[in-house]
Regions:
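Residues at secondary-structure transition points
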Residues: 5, 9, 13, 38, ...
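Active-site metal-binding core of divalent-cation-utilizing nuclease and nuclease-like domains
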Residues: 24-53, 132
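Solvent-exposed beta-strand sheet faces enriched in polar/charged residues
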Residues: 33, 57, 107-109
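Mg2+/Mn2+-dependent nuclease catalytic core
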Residues: 60-93
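Domain-level recognition of nuclease-like catalytic cores that cleave nucleotide substrates
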Residues: 96-133
């Protein structure tokens, strides 16, 4: 129970950090936590006319099994094909409901939080459906 609460807290913090990270990279945040019964999209953003549906995967550095190998750890690899399919389905519905004809894509942001120093390391992987993770 405590671990689940900790995981949710890290996820919530990670999503906020990812949104700020994307804004600094020139993205406009359109929505956050878009939910449907079969899935949720953490961040919906736009950049250069393309709608971006962003899945955020965040972990706390303190929870890593081997902190010395932090640079090798990739939280974005936790996004599997099943999750990508759910994201694609939810994204398509969002575009249909909003009658949005623009191009869209699925992106992933991996976040490693260093809670002791209140810092984070973020990585953006664009076009995740193309196997860019």
């Amino acid at each position: 129970m405590v671990q689940d609460a900790q995981r949710k807290r890290v996820g919530r913090i990670g999503e906020g950090i990812a949104a700020q990270f994307l804004e600094r990279k020139g993205f406009k945040i359109l929505a956050r936590n878009y939910r449907k019964p079969w899935g949720e999209i953490d961040i919906i953003a736009e950049k250069r006319g393309t709608v971006r549906f962003v899945e955020v995967k965040a972990v706390s550095r303190e929870s890593l099994p081997d902190v010395s190998r932090e640079m090798d750890y990739r939280p974005e690899e936790m996004v599997d094909v099943r999750k990508l399919r759910k994201l694609a389905r939810t994204a398509a519905l969002y575009m249909e409901v909003h009658k949005d004809k623009r191009e869209y894509q699925i992106d992933v942001v991996g976040v490693i939080l260093v809670e002791a120093t209140r810092k984070a390391r973020c990585r953006l992987f664009e076009q995740a459906l193309e196997g860019n993770l």
